[in-house]
A protein has these predicted regions:
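Conserved Radical SAM active-site core
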Residues: 59-168
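Conserved AdoMet/S-adenosylmethionine-binding subsite of the radical SAM
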Residues: 119-266
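N-terminal [4Fe-4S]-dependent radical SAM core
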Residues: 1-47, 53-55, 59-77, 81-106
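A short small-residue
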Residues: 57-63, 109-112, 209-215, 253-255
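Auxiliary Fe-S-binding modules of radical SAM enzymes
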Residues: 1-35, 221-289
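Short aromatic/hydrophobic contact patches that present stacked aromatics
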Residues: 39-43, 109-111, 146, 173
């Protein structure tokens, strides 16, 4: 059971600590460079259900057919307790967090994420309603909601319905690790046509601003070729031209503790070069982790 792990190893770059469930099943603490502080994560994929097989993902995956619902009553209890804990300031006395600056330990956001793809969660609407309700109670300082997704379940009517509950301050972070079919298939491990991935990003990006999350790695010993990066930047430019509003781009790599025989970390100099190219050609805010 996920909740039995005290600290879950993380799968992407930029996170200063692991997922800290502290005995809970659905809600974990996460210190993240991407959010410059403490987040609460909600695990919408307890079974690890995901329809991608990213070459850098360290979480054992099961088929998307094995998706399981979230116990929303349990989630509400865990979320309330975790929010109370953060609001009380006790988190600064936790041994695993005491070495971090105090300003990192106030709550930045609540993330819909987890061990697999959150938009595949069968009761996504109920989860979202639970989070929005906790925020509407007004017992805690305002926190934004962030959905971290590969986009594959975004077309589901219940996900579309749930996203109507997002305010302008909330964010959707969408995965885009490639600029061509072959690069996408190599990174994601699936044969979904790349144009479908871009269409999903475009569709949402026309409705609300999105944050693009891109992970680049050295795969089988080779860093991404210059042409691949150019194609990736060109895709972002086309999305913009066609009406997607890109609020920010996150550029990151595999961290060394989740490196595999296939995927290893890219040096900061290469990540910074990619970030500069995106900034120059798109004129959007880019952060490197
Ligand atoms: S989409 Fe996310 S959870 Fe799914 S395989 Fe890729 S990194 Fe892992």
């Amino acid at each position: 059971m996920k909740g039995s792990r005290r600290v879950r190893a993380i799968r992407v770059a930029g996170r200063a600590a692991g997922r800290d469930y502290q005995g809970r099943s659905w809600v974990y603490f996460l210190l993240s460079a991407q959010t410059r502080g403490l987040s609460l994560g909600v695990n919408l994929s307890p079974s690890g259900a995901c329809d991608y097989r990213c070459c850098y993902c360290d979480i054992p995956k099961v088929s998307a057919l094995h998706r399981a619902p979230v116990d929303v009553q349990g989630l509400a209890l865990e979320l309330g307790a975790a929010l109370d804990f953060v609001a009380s300031g006790q988190v600064v006395h936790e041994p695993s967090y005491s070495r971090f600056p105090k300003e990192w330990l106030s709550l930045r956001q609540v993330m819909l994420s987890g061990e697999g793809e959150p938009t595949l969660c069968p009761n996504f609407v109920e989860v979202m309603e639970t989070l929005v309700h906790a925020r509407a109670l007004g017992r805690y300082p305002f926190f934004k909601l962030v959905l971290e997704t590969n986009g594959s379940g975004l077309q589901r009517p219940e996900v579309q319905q749930a996203l109507e509950l997002f305010t302008a301050q909330d964010e959707v972070w969408m995965k885009l690790d490639a600029g061509t079919d072959s690069q996408f298939h190599g990174m994601s491990g699936v044969d979904t046509p790349f144009r479908e991935v871009l269409a999903r990003i475009l569709e949402l990006g026309r409705r609300r601003p999105i944050v693009i999350q891109s992970l680049f790695a050295s795969v089988d010993g080779s860093p991404p070729a210059r042409g691949e990066i150019q194609n990736y930047v060109r895709c972002l430019g086309l999305l913009q031209e066609q009406g997607a509003v890109i609020q920010r781009v996150h550029i990151q790599s595999v961290m060394n503790w989740v490196e595999s025989s296939r995927c290893t970390h890219l040096p900061l100099a290469i990540l910074s070069e990619i970030a500069c190219q995106v900034r120059r050609e798109l004129g959007v805010e880019v952060e490197v982790f």
